[in-house]
Structure formats: C-alpha cells, structure tokens
Amino acid sequence: MAWRQAQPSRRQPAIFPSRTTLGRAVELLSHALFPGRIGAFAGDAAAEDRFVAERLDAAFTLLDEAIRAEFAYWQDVSAIDFAPERPAEILRLFAGTLSRVRALIDTDVAAIFRGDPAARSVDEILICYPGAVAILHHRLAHELDALGVPIVARIVSEIANERTGIDIHPGATIGPGFFIDHGTGVVIGETAVIGARVRLYQHVTLGARTPLADAAPGPRDRFARHPIVEDDVVIYAGSTILGRVTIGAGAVIGGNVWLLE
C-alpha cells in the first residue's frame, strides 16, 4: 500500500498492449519473413506474394492496436500528447526495416548451421532452436524499441524469454551472425553492444554492475552500463560479464568466468 500511495493518481485505468495480441503479431510476421519455412506455405510465386501480404496486413493491424494502447498509457501517466498519425508512421517505418531484419536473421541462422554439427537443416534451426527463436524476436523488438514503443518491444522480448529462457533486452545492439548455443539462462542487458559473428553459450550474462538507485518511477536517463563484445568473440557457459567492459575482437572467454574489468 505504501508504494501505491506514493504514486501519482491515474486519470483512468491502465490499458497495456496485449501479450496475446503481440504474440500473434510476431507469429504472423514470422510467417511473412519465412513463408516457406515457418509459414508452411506451398504454392507458386504469385500465391506466395498474396500469402505474405495477407500476413503482413494482419500483423500490422495487431501492432497498430498495441501501439495505440501504449500511447494511451504514456499519455495518461505523463500527460504527453501524441499526434494521431504517429502509430501509422511507426508502422510505416517498421515495415521498412523488415527486409533488413530478414537479412540479419539469415546470417544468424547461417552462423548456427555452421557452428552446430547437430543441426541437420536451416528449417530445423528456424523451427526448433531456442537461440533462433530468441534472436528473431529480438530483431523485431529492437526495431520497435528504436521507433519509440518500448513497452510493445519489451513484451515481444519477454514472449521470447517465456518460450526459450533467453532474456535479451530490446535495446541491446547485436551484429550479424549471432549464435546462442543451447541458450537457457542467457541474459543480455539494455545497453550491451555485440559485434559480428559472436557466439554465446548457456547461462552467459552480459549485465550491469549496480542497479539504479531507488528513485521515483518514470522516465530515467539511459546510460551505458553493459558490456561491449567485439567481433568473433566466444563466451562459454556460465560466464558473467558486468559493467561497461570491452571484450576485444577474437577473444575466447572460458566457462564460469566472473569478469568486471
């Protein structure tokens, strides 16, 4: 009760973006990005174009609903007014990122296939591998976060966390060819920067050394507090790297390492 009493009163009940709605939106986007694999489409090119267009249209309808819910929330807690056309503009910009997102995911899947002799096909990777599921969600969430809908983006990332046990903040910047092997327990913080062709094993943490001091809820300054991992780094299972430290290109970090500097 003390916490509740300390908060500013709300003008109306909070309505947040729906987890179910966003889960379905990501599913539809996955079908559109990989129609012949995740979408299970079979047909000629013209039919495939229609399939993709229908999935994108349905996904954008759901995303529009979620974005409007987030804007209503922020407008209530901060009294910020948003232009009515802003959700449509965000969706337009997000749509423009999808070809780049698809290309990045292709590099991630290729890295997994090269790095795991147990992988029999890229189809198996896209459908079964938790690292592939997590990075697909992250690539989409990262674009949404950059476009100014952090709650929508965070829900997308948490859907992946629930499914895979891999926790990647949508603010984290991750280069091409990213491979999380096994994946359970991996944590990547908001301001982490990861280069190209990086491989992480299970239970790796790229975290911050200290939490924010107790402060009133609301907008906070976002400062760089998570590691920088340069190109071609391998970090083995159970290692914890905290703070704004830099892991140089080509480094190999052994298992169960605790690294602060």
Task: Enumerate the predicted regions with their spans.
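Terminal amphipathic alpha-helical/low-complexity segments used for targeting or macromolecular assembly
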Residues: 1-158
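Structural signal for interior beta-strand "rungs" in well-ordered beta-sheet cores
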Residues: 161-261
